[in-house]
Design a protein with these regions (language model features):
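Short loop/turn segments immediately following the C-termini of beta-strands
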Residues: 73, 129, 186, 243, ...
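Blade-level signature of beta-propeller repeat domains, shared across WD40, Kelch, NHL, RCC1
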Residues: 339-367
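Conserved beta-propeller blade signature
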Residues: 67-69, 123-125, 180-182, 237-239, ...
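Residue-level detector of Asp-centered blade-edge/turn motifs that repeat once per structural unit
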Residues: 62-65, 118-121, 175-178, 232-235, ...
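Gly/Pro-rich loop segments of beta-rich domains
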Residues: 24-56, 86-112, 141-169, 198-226, ...
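Short loop/turn segments that connect beta-strands within beta-propeller blades
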Residues: 81-86, 138-142, 195-199, 252-256, ...
Length: 367
């Protein structure tokens, strides 16, 4: 926009009116808190979300009902914000537990839920991390069922029923267009897949041991270092953020190859803008892809939200100051955050953020 203002210069004289017009119409990223008071707790449930306490919101999605759904790591709950801005608790007891299949939704107990997703049939999936399982509510949200994991930490079961396989602290889940479920099995340094038709689980990426990932190489015998979060783009490619690896990868499932797109592998505070493969990241724990194909990252340990632009191959820091805090509404890059985790790219172009240790849900938007 600065260069447009310079068009107002004639014979060495700066046209102040041109500059004023440019300044007044310049659009930037803003941020607002849409839920939470900044204090951890559960007070204010069934009231206005902005006046209600939250407790470490992690995964966040827009539901098929138009409501915002999120899971709370600190209270082991699943909650919902309706179109009127009212927050309610859907499931979870406020203490850790491990409910058996068939438990009514309102009576369920979870153990450090990390992420939630909706499938094409209107069923809500829950990453029940410390129970080492992926759970699901029925389409009527009445009963709980397990779709992967035995509840015992470990690694086993490839080639067999997912409900008989062991997982090790699953952190993220996403579904492809066929309804197959992809899991970040971070404790095993693997990405695993549950077939929608057969329920059989297989490993699609990782060796089971942490290590540097070979760029552009086959998925076969290629290690991962802390696979943490997943999302699919419009081409059906799987995007993966690695927590300990501090990198962002694109996986071509048809060709079974993995490509580095961002992150030097060095841990550090991201620059305001940097060439993608030279960018430093610090524990990325959320991935979301917007309608334009940009990949958003919750760079948790730098307390920032980043955007990878595949057209320019750059990583830009959109929100956060790099310091941990609970900043005000306003310009996004002036709002301190506190270990954000969950991200969701909404249909209007805004980004929903689970600002975990600020105990807020925030919305990043461009205006």
């Amino acid at each position: 926009m600065f260069f447009l203002a310079l068009l107002g210069i004639a014979e060495g004289v700066l046209d102040v009116r041109a500059c004023a017009q440019t300044s007044s119409t310049e659009r930037t990223w803003h941020i607002e808190s849409i839920a939470g008071t900044g204090t951890a707790g559960h007070e204010g449930n069934e009231g206005p979300a902005k006046s209600a306490q939250l407790n470490n919101p992690f995964g966040i999605v827009r539901g098929p009902d138009g409501a915002i759904w999120f899971c709370e790591y600190g209270s082991h709950r699943i909650r919902r914000i309706d179109s009127h801005g009212v927050v309610t608790t859907i499931s979870g007891q406020g203490i850790p537990g491990n409910s058996p299949d068939g438990t009514a939704t309102k009576d369920c107990a979870f153990n450090l839920p990390h992420e939630i997703r909706w499938d094409q049939d209107g069923r809500l999936l829950i990453v029940d991390m410390a129970n080492h399982t992926i759970r699901r509510f029925s389409s009527s949200l009445q009963r709980l069922e397990t779709i992967a994991g035995t509840g015992v930490k470990g690694y086993s079961g490839d080639g067999g029923p997912a409900i008989e396989a062991q997982l090790n602290q699953p952190h993220s889940v996403q579904l492809d267009s066929q309804g197959n479920v992809f899991i970040c099995d971070i404790g095993n340094h693997l990405v695993r897949r549950v077939d929608a038709k057969t329920g059989v689980i297989t490993t699609i990426a990782g060796t089971g041991k942490p290590g540097p990932t070979r760029d552009g190489d086959s998925l076969s015998d290629n290690p991962l270092h802390g696979p943490r979060s997943l999302d699919f783009d419009s081409q059906g490619h799987l995007w993966l953020g690695t927590r300990e690896g501090n990198q962002l990868f694109e996986i071509d499932l048809d060709r079974a190859r993995i490509h580095l797109r961002a992150g030097s592998g060095k841990k550090g505070l991201p620059s305001k803008i940097a060439a993608a493969k030279e960018a430093t990241l610090n524990g990325p724990k959320g991935v979301a892809i917007d309608a334009e194909g940009n990949v958003w990252l919750a760079d948790t340990e730098s307390h920032c939200i980043l955007r990878f632009n595949p057209k320019t191959a750059t990583v830009e820091r959109i929100a956060g100051t790099g310091e941990k805090g609970d900043g005000p509404d306003g310009p996004a890059d002036q709002c301190a955050m506190a270990r954000p985790h969950g991200l969701f790219a909404d249909t209007d172009g805004s980004i929903l953020v689970g600002d975990s240790e600020a105990h807020r849900i925030r919305r990043i938007y461009f205006q």
